[in-house]
Amino acid sequence: MLDPKVIVALDYPNQDAALAFVDRIEPGSCRLKVGKEMFTLYGPDFVRKLHECGHSVFLDLKFHDIPNTCSRAVAAAAELGVWMVNVHASGGERMMAASRDILEPYGKDRPLLIAVTVLTSMEASDLAGIGIACAPQEQVLNLATLTKNSGLDGVVCSAQESTMLKSALGKEFQLITPGIRPVGSAAGDQRRVMTPVEAVSAGSDYLVIGRPITQATDPSAVLAEINQSLA
């Protein structure tokens, strides 16, 4: 696939298990997401190993800091050669704009830069607990609009917000959606979930899927089935 929609979340207890999984799937069938746990344990060398296997990597570290510090972290991700990197939209416009600007020298080789809006585990009561009075959907739109105005490529959002965001922010604004569960999968700790077909129909551009693929007896077959459903 030239532009696979599935991003597999590599949430493994150790590097060997992750690399064993990677050996079982075709690089062109998906992209891989490396999050905080695995990056903290195994660092940039782990990402380099994934690149050596032919895979594109979404570095999901959700940078959130003062503009100078955040932008330098984003530049470090670009130097590592990742396909996508993210920041927290709640860091504000100056932080996001600085992160965007620092990628300009990379031209067409720069990673996609996206922002996290409202974590998919959060409900209205969770937002209220941190002093945000609006509903999750309203806060997602607020932060996604700020992200677009800051010049970023897109946002992480739940599939339930995808149609709203595509309508409000345009088709070119990329939507990356976690909380995706193929039919028959458990919801786990995600609160706002959809199937792959539902999510793409709603407007999501890329789908983050973890355990339904990584814990499958035949992950390549599960991935192929998902890709076929989206063809």
UniProtKB/Swiss-Prot annotation:
What the protein does comes down to: Catalyzes the decarboxylation of orotidine 5'-monophosphate (OMP) to uridine 5'-monophosphate (UMP).
What are the binding positions for substrate in this chain?
A: 11, 33, 60-69, 120, 181, 190, 210-211
Q: Which SMART domains match?
A: OMPdecase
Supply the HAMAP family for this chain: OMPdecase_type1_B
Query: Which domain of life, per UniProt?
Result: Bacteria
KW Magnesium (keyword) present: no
Q: Could you say which protein family the record assigns here?
A: Belongs to the OMP decarboxylase family. Type 1 subfamily.
EC supergroup of this enzyme: lyase
Q: Which InterPro entries does the entry link to?
A: Aldolase_TIM, OMPdecase, OMPdecase_AS, OMPdecase_bac, OMPdeCOase_dom, RibuloseP-bd_barrel
Catalytically driven reaction(s):
orotidine 5'-phosphate + H(+) = UMP + CO2
Q: Does the keyword Lipid biosynthesis apply?
A: no
Q: Which organism is it from?
A: Photobacterium profundum (strain SS9)
* Keywords associated with the record: Decarboxylase, Lyase, Pyrimidine biosynthesis
Q: What is its EC number?
A: 4.1.1.23
This protein's name = Orotidine 5'-phosphate decarboxylase
**GO molecular function terms noted in the UniProt entry:** orotidine-5'-phosphate decarboxylase activity
**Any idea which residues are catalytic in this one?**
62
